[in-house]
Amino acid sequence: MTRSETLFEQAKKTIPGGVNSPVRAFNGVGGSPRFIEKADGAYIYDADGKAYIDYVGSWGPMILGHNHPKIRQAVLDAVENGLSFGAPTELEVRMAEKVIEMVPSMEQVRMVSSGTEATMSAIRLARGFTNRDKILKFEGCYHGHADCLLVKAGSGALTLGQPSSPGIPEDFAKHTLTAVYNELESVKTLFEQYPEEIACIILEPVAGNMNCIPPIPGFLEGLRALCDQYGALLIIDEVMTGFRVSKSGAQGHYGITPDLTTLGKVIGGGMPVGAFGGRKEVMQFIAPTGPVYQAGTLSGNPIAMSAGLAQMEELCAEGLYEELAAKTKRIAEGFKAAANKHGIPLSINYVGGMFGFFFTELEQVTRFDQVTQCDAEAFRTFYHGMLDEGVYLAPSAYEAGFLSMAHGEKELEETLAAADRVFARMAK
């Protein structure tokens, strides 16, 4: 047995399934997960000492690469002053100002400790502000594991093959309406059925938990118009896309102004973090200025704020997002070219620093039902082939891939050469 396999068996004795988040268990691809000991730049290193070119990036946060020297130093400096205070700090003020500077729709910001906490709080705020109960989400979109959101959820819940999770009362789920991502008519139908009951729409502007599905032209604009027409709030969940798709997130990339935005991942520089914010009129409805309650022991934690600020400042460098997008395009288009060369049906999507690939005859994948019909066995074969070649992809056909600024010419060339070899073996 490898060291990773030994650790996995040991972990299963004390941790449910041996992991602290289901997708890490490799259930979607089979085999044993790699236990990671360290990471640097574009590489992660497992417990057996093997290096992998990493396209998971801790599921998105590591946009500058692992163990970035400025982020590491910011954390070390912050630790000198203490780990947590449970009181306001200048760091959280600076973080809020930086977020507002980069995302104009966010006039005020509340820091929390996770993406789930951010979306849960934003929905509570939307319900309180509108005095309505129902929310509208999309099949295949994942917004964390709050009860009201695990209804036909994507990501790990999709991999488990469960449309929702046991333990969620029907009385909770009945207030969550689900529509078809990229199909505006399904949203219109729900608003016509519940014209004065829907508090908000929440969506991933680029669906990154059913692989990578960008919005089709007119979809986001149509949602904005419907929210305005029916008095609902538009919540854009940018936990994944925030500061990864562009300097101002997916909303800046596509030119859409939401009422509320949720953030996470990138704004923590690798530390646990989340945030939600939006129009001042709405944000003033949250305690202590308003009646909607929300609180958190570690909200605005100084270590997370220090790491996040260091990363956010680096992301303001001229030309950074253009370079990141070019790298992402090269990987995605390179996968497509290699698959075509060997007669393997493959469709690709990419935007900013995110990419996805689908084993299907379809030219473009735009909907949840199309994702579920892709060739899962081909994905598993490709995944393990790439893993053997030293390339670490997300261990699920329902997860997006991520590039970082640390991925250089060498890593891109080696990844595409590996893909060519794996596709060649699959074609035999």
Swiss-Prot record:
A GO BP annotation? protoporphyrinogen IX biosynthetic process
Cofactor(s) for this protein?
Answer: pyridoxal 5'-phosphate
**A family per Pfam:** Aminotran_3
Alphabetized UniProt keyword annotations: Cytoplasm, Isomerase, Porphyrin biosynthesis, Pyridoxal phosphate
> What reaction is this protein's catalytic activity?
(S)-4-amino-5-oxopentanoate = 5-aminolevulinate
Q: Family assignment?
A: Belongs to the class-III pyridoxal-phosphate-dependent aminotransferase family. HemL subfamily.
| Protein name, per record | Glutamate-1-semialdehyde 2,1-aminomutase
Q: Which organism is it from?
A: Shewanella loihica (strain ATCC BAA-1088 / PV-4)
